[in-house]
Amino acid sequence: KFPLKIINEKPYIDVLVKSGKSETLAKVLVDNGNSDALWLFANRTNIIEIPSKNIPDFLGRGFSGNIYGKKGRIEYMKLGKYEFKNIITSFPDSVSTQNINNTIDRWGSIGGEVLRRFYQIFDYKNNALYLKPNKNFEQEFLYDKSGLELQHEGMEWVEERIEVRGHYKGEVFDGTGEKITNSFAYKFDLKPIYKIFNVRTSSSAEAAGLKVNDQLISINGKIAYKMSLDQITKLLRGPEDKIIKLEVLRDGKAIPIRFRLRTML
């Protein structure tokens, strides 16, 4: 059970963090909609330091535009009796934090990558948050090792060929009773379009020549529109040196791209 503070109709809790010389208590927004583990606003205090080993990164989109900053691993974050070591933490830059909720003593956000490890009950009436570890609790904190940020760019009609099967052992017959071999039909379905909207500087994706607005056709032999964005994201968070083979559409041409996932943190 954790004390929950409601400020401007938003929930906050206190966590202990160490990113620098000292451990400090930080008030953070509880944000299940944020896919990262932890955000800290280093520019609002001199106690929190950005780790020396970090990468510049696109952190997300807010109401006022894109949010950029850095990612690094801090020594730990403590949530009551639960401790997360070497947790991947995002540090929005000062320009981005100007447009983020300016609660005076807010130091960041705790996001979905931590919260998904718990069963959660929000008791707003009694200002309490109940957390209980679930099956995800011991999972490693992962991050994108490709340098790609993908987004859903709407839908498109796709023609697919399907085999027409008869009722007996796959046999198909025409109107005269003659057997038809290799019978196919075609159907049109609306499928998702995935495009690249950011390529991290000095990443494997940048080195391989991938560009903003490239449309993803396939990844490791799987047609992109048959996958969810979450499934693709998980592939790009795979182990060091995993080979990624993409086919992208650029200016009407299909381009094959191959690179390896690279650990940068």
Question: What are these model-derived regions, one by one?
Answer:
Residues 12-60, 111, 198, 202:
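Aspartyl protease active-site motif detector
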Residues 99-100, 143, 147-149, 159, ...:
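C-terminal, low-ordered peptide segments at domain boundaries
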Residues 211, 217, 233-265:
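PDZ-domain C-terminal substructure recognizer with occasional recognition of PDZ-binding tails
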Residues 154-218, 222:
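PDZ/PDZ-like domain segments forming the peptide/carboxylate-binding groove
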Residues 77, 111, 148, 205, ...:
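Terminal peptide-recognition signature
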Residues 1-25, 54-73, 100-103, 233:
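Pepsin-like aspartyl protease folds
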Residues 1-5, 84-154:
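Glycine-rich flap/beta-hairpin and adjacent strands of clan AA aspartyl proteases
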Residues 223-231, 256:
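Short, Lys/Arg- and Gly-enriched loop/turn segments at beta-strand edges
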